[in-house]
Amino acid sequence: MAKKLKKNEEITKKFGDERRKALDDALKNIEKDFGKGAVMRLGERAEQKVQVMSSGSLALDIALGAGGYPKGRIIEIYGPESSGKTTVALHAVAQAQKEGGIAAFIDAEHALDPAYAAALGVNIDELLLSQPDSGEQGLEIAGKLIDSGAVDLVVVDSVAALVPRAEIDGDIGDSHVGLQARMMSQAMRKLSASINKTKTIAIFINQLREKVGVMFGNPETTPGGRALKFYASVRLDVRGTTQIKGTGDQKDSSIGKETKIKVVKNKVAPPFKVAEVEIMYGEGISRTGELVKIASDLDIIQKAGAWFSYNGEKIGQGSENAKRYLADHPELFDEIDRKVRVKFGLLEESEEESAMVVASEEIDDLALDLDNGIEIED
C-alpha cells in the first residue's frame, strides 16, 4: 500500500513538473509575441492597491470608500436636471489641477460657464476644452487625449448630448433606433483598455429619462444604452433635496440646496453609501460646511450649545461662523481635514499623530485616576 502511494506521488510530481514547464514555455512565447508584461502573476504587479484622486469633497471621498475616484477607471454621474452633476465634475477638475494634473472637458452640451468653473477653483487658463460637432467627434477627441497618457482627467458632459453624425445629417423626425447606444458601446470597448493603461479618470455625466409604460419598479433610466453602466467602476446618483435659506437680509432667498450623492455602483469599495453636501449657488460644494458637520460628529470639533471649538479654542458661535473661521484659516482647515481622513482610514496616521494620540490617552487615563481618588506613584 505504501509503495502504491509513493508511486502515485511520483507520478503527480512528474505531471506537475511537466505542466509547470509547459506554462513557462507558453509565458515565454506570449512575452515574445506581445511584449513583456502581457501576462503576469497578480502578485508581481508593482501596485496592488487602487490609486485614487480626491473628488474635491470630503463627504464624497468617504462615501466612495477608497478616498476618491479610482485612477484608470470610468465614472458615471447622473441625476435629474439642475441637481449638481456638472458641479460635482468641476470639483474633480479643480482637484486634478490642484494636484498638478491636466484636465480636459468635452462640452457636448455647449453650456459650460467659465465664470462658474473659475469660482469652483478651476484654472480655466489650463483647462482643455472641446465643444464637438457630433458624438463621434467628441468621443474620438476624448480617445486621443486618453491615448496620449498626458491627461489625468477627462470629463464628458453629457452622454445624452453626444448626438451621432447620422442623426445630425438627417431630418427631425427620422428614426435612428439604437444608434447612440451602438456608438457608446463601441466607444466603451475602445476606451476602457486605454483608460486603465494610462491611469486616466474618465467621468461621463448623464441625464435621466423615463421608460414608457412601466407600472412597477423604477421607471428612470439613463440614455446611451447599457454599455456605460457595465464599464463604469463607479456610478453616482446626484439629487438635490431641500433649499438652503440665507440669513439676515437674505432670509427669504435661496442661497443653495442640500444634495445627496448616492454611490449606486462601486467596484473598489462597498456601494450604496450616501454623501450629503451643501451646494451653494455660485460657489459649489461647501467644503467648510461638510468638514464642520463630519468633524463634529466625530468629536474632532467639539460642540457645546451653539459654540464650536477645536483643541479647547472656540472657532465660532453657530455653524455659519465656524465655517467662516475655517475658511479664513486654511492651515486649520487642512489639519482637521487630515484628522477626519485618518479617522476613516483614507490616510495613514503619521508617527507624530500617533504619539499625540497616545499622549492624549495617557492624560485622559491620569485624569480618570485622579477623579477616582487613586494615588499616583512618583
Swiss-Prot record:
In terms of SMART domains, this protein maps to: AAA
Q: Which GO terms describe its molecular function?
A: ATP binding; ATP hydrolysis activity; ATP-dependent DNA damage sensor activity; damaged DNA binding; single-stranded DNA binding
The signal peptide, as residue positions, is none
* Keywords noted in UniProt: ATP-binding, Cytoplasm, DNA damage, DNA recombination, DNA repair, DNA-binding, Nucleotide-binding, SOS response
Annotated localization: Cytoplasm
- Biological processes per GO annotation: DNA recombination; DNA repair; SOS response
Checking PANTHER family in the record gives: MITOCHONDRIAL DNA REPAIR PROTEIN RECA HOMOLOG-RELATED, RECA
What this protein is called in its record is Protein RecA
Q: Which organism is it from?
A: Streptococcus pyogenes serotype M28 (strain MGAS6180)
Query: Source gene?
Result: recA
